[in-house]
Amino acid sequence: MRFFVLGAGSWGTVFAQILHENGEEVVLWARRKEIVDLINVSHTSPYVEESKITVRATNDLEEIKKEDILVIAIPVQYIREHLLRLPVKPSMVLNLSKGIEIKTGKRVSEIVEEILGCPYAVLSGPSHAEEVAKKLPTAVTLAGENSKELQKRISTEYFRVYTCEDVVGVEIAGALKNVIAIAAGILDGFGGWDNAKAALETRGIYEIARFGMFFGADQKTFMGLAGIGDLMVTCNSRYSRNRRFGELIARGFNPLKLLESSNQVVEGAFTVKAVMKIAKENKIDMPISEEVYRVVYEGKPPLQSMRDLMRRSLKDEFWAS
């Protein structure tokens, strides 16, 4: 089965190149023709510096075949409209995107089930495209159908794939870590509050796990690569858009204007909208996410949010909110 990669941003392009170098047949779809031409003619991409891209690119969705494995690598808020445009139903879907659809509160697996109803798997973990492109050691988690077969086809000497059975946990961990990373970036913008950042990341994984377990996720998923692994890299890496977004907020930039002017999607800023709606409907305590929402959408001063988190009622540590 051929891989049809939907999305030629940094991660979609790098992942397509992994597959191609593994001997797989791959087609990479890009929305813009100029990106397609760069990849096909110059073998370069504006999203992947200093790497030769040797996959074939197209901007024609009609090229997808029903035998293909569709790899989703576009922002979550645009997945539905692209799936509805597909001329055929693919043999299965492998999702690389991280987030929750705002208007429905659905995870990507639920969107795929609703529209395509085909086998589904999700790949997640600490995997910034910039490092994978340089073939630096990376390990990720794959959950879902046909995971053992996909594990063999995707893994390389530098890209190690583990499997698990918890699709819900892997999806939720990947989505919510972006929200916590915005808060981590705010602390970075304050000038390196190491104690506070360690506490934030620790309490953040509890918050993510609490949300996920409400929907049936396995607690141990959040202690693995898809959970604490991805959270750590997103909260600390210079490549993290969500962390950088929070850092700029702390330095005085208007968050809504930042979102308008950004040429890359800050997924956590959209995910937090969906998370807070779901949390309120189900009475799930999400104190960090709530403060991120207030800073981004209600104009609350970030320093005040940090203070309010510290002033919450005292609790036991383990699995307390």
Curated annotation (Swiss-Prot):
It comes from the Bacteria. It is found in: Cytoplasm. It is an enzyme of class 1 (oxidoreductase). Sn-glycerol 3-phosphate binds at residues 98, 125, 127, 177, 230, 240-242. It holds the Pfam family NAD_Gly3P_dh_N. The active site is at 177 (proton acceptor). Its EC number is 1.1.1.94. This is Glycerol-3-phosphate dehydrogenase [NAD(P)+]. It comes from Thermotoga sp. (strain RQ2). The gene is gpsA.
